[in-house]
Every structure is written in structure tokens, then in C-alpha cells.
Amino acid sequence: MKHILFLLTSIALLLSACAPLTKSSNATPSPTPLPQPILDPGYAQDAPSTATPPTDPTPFDPAPVSSGLLPADETNTYWAVNPSSGSRLFVRVAYPRAWNGELVPALVLVPGGTGATEPRKAEALAAEGFLVIIFDPEGRGRSEGTEDYNGFIGQDGLAAVIEAATALPGLDANRYGLVSYSYGVTLATGALARHPDLPIDFYIDWEGPVDRTYTTTGCGANRAGGIQWQACSNESWWAEREALNFIAEVRVPYQRIQSQTDHVQPTNNHAIDIVNAAVAGGVPWVRLNEYPAGQTYDATNQPAMLPDSMDKQIDRTVATYARYIIETVVNQ
């Protein structure tokens, strides 16, 4: 009997020695994700906003720009985070064809209407020697969120893209411009006015509608284009979406590009309106096309605008004006 008990005990010891070890609970933890880029919530305090307020109202410094852009799924594509909505905004970057790693002038392009990124424009301006940043505004293209029609939330998103993009290799922060097309003027002027510390050196506006009358092409029942569904009597809605509300607060050189025949409007009065408002508001340098800077104009006796053929060369015109402003205004 003793021999049997001894044999059973020996077998039990052998089985326990061969059993797999229990996995330690002290395994190396997964790396902590990098913080999402956040901008100073104080940016949105200059005017009432429909944006969701930050959960922590305590003031804090902006996140380091090195964490500002998160890589997306293609080469030279990224995500920036809109601090007002938490939405990820899709960003694409185009470099000059012969870029060798040196610092080059940069442009952020704001699309017209309720459009998204336009890679063709980016490539055309990159061919002119610029590093070009394009993006899908809130709720458009590949970006998250809900369409904001260039209101405060959209403006905060543009500000986040501008700030975050300063981390891009090759971007010269001393030659960094903003370019808007058509209704993009609302997004651009709102971002510059409400975020006065943005690292933008100059602003170029192509034929932007400057208030609700132009944006709706007349505010009447038979509107020809623009935002058809929003009543012009909705003061709170339009207060966020009229460039004339913001232009006087812009503190960088401003260039207006205007063709003789506007791409939407029946007159060019809107160009006169915004240039005059910019000069009256003390914008540091204001120019209409190639006329002397600082001039104001009479809408009933307008100067000749650019020939309509220039619309087919708009990318080259933007590049020419950007180089002129950099060389004669920004770097002086």
C-alpha cells in the first residue's frame, strides 16, 4: 500500500512540474496614445459661439505643434482636430516638385462654396514653388462632423489646421499665407479675426461674397445661387457668416482679387465694399488687384477689374500676388 501511495505522489509532482506557467499580470502595457491637438479655448471667446464648450474651462497653453497633425492613410495626408467640435479634419499637403528639404513659402487654401479639397489647385500652386495645404472643412469630404456653412465651428477648424500645419517639414513660418476662394472668404476672415494670434503672414481673397445679400445673390424669392434656404432675417445665423463682420479685425496684409465679370455676382460692388471696410478698419496693408495699396473706391465709379481671361490663370495670379506680398510687404 505504501508503494502505491508513493507512486501516486510522484506522478502528481511530475504533472505539476510540467503544467504551463500562468501569464504574469505585469506584462508591458501598450504605449499611451499621443494627445490630440487642442487649441486654446480662449480663441472662441471673442464672440458667442454655437460650439460645444471645452469640458475643462481652465485656461491652458495650446498643445505643442509637433503633435498637431496625425498621419492619415496616404502619403502627405493627415488629420487635424477641431477643438470646438472634436471632429477630425482631413488635410492633404503638396510639396514643390523639386523640393530638397529647404524651407519654402506655404499657402493654406480655403475652398469655395461648401466644397472640399481641390488637389488640382494644390498641385498647380506647388508647381509655382509653394508648400500647399488643403483640407476638407467640417462635415465635408473625408472630414468628420456636421456642415457648419463657414460659421464659428468651421472657422475654429480652419484655425486648427493653420496652427497644426506649422509642424510640417519645409514650411517657412515667415512666409505663410492664407488663400480663400469665393464663399471661403467667410471661413478665412472669421478665423483670422477671432484667432488673432494665428501664424499667418498675409491673406489673399478671390471674389468672396462679403455679406448675406451677396451670399444669397439678392435675399429675394428668386435667388440665383448661393445659400437658398436660410432667411436673410436670421440675424444670429448670419452674424457668424458675413466677411464684412470680420475684415476690420484682420491684422495681416490683405489682397483682393476681382475679375471684371464676377464668377457669381452681377456686379463687383462686393469687392469695393470689403476693400473699403478693410482700409477703414485699419488692416495693415490692403490692395485691390494691382492698384496702389491703401486706396478706397466709389462703387458708382469703379476702377477696371482684372480681365476675365485671368480666371483661367487664377492659380498663377495667386502665386504672383503671394510672391509680391512676401517680397515687398512681409519681408520688409
Protein language model annotation of sequence segments:
Residues A126-E144:
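Conserved alpha/beta-hydrolase
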Residues L13, C18-L70, A221:
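Ser/Thr-rich, Proline-interspersed low-complexity disordered segments
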Residues D201, G208-F246:
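Mobile cap/lid helix-loop segments that gate and shape the active-site cleft of serine hydrolases
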Residues P48-N100:
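N-terminal cap/lid segment of alpha/beta-hydrolase-fold proteins
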Residues G281-Q332:
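C-terminal catalytic histidine-bearing segment of alpha/beta-hydrolase fold enzymes
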Residues E102-G112:
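Short beta-strand element of the alpha/beta-hydrolase
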Residues D148-P169:
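Alpha/beta-hydrolase active-site loop
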Residues V250, R256-S259:
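Short beta-strand/loop motif that positions the catalytic acidic residue
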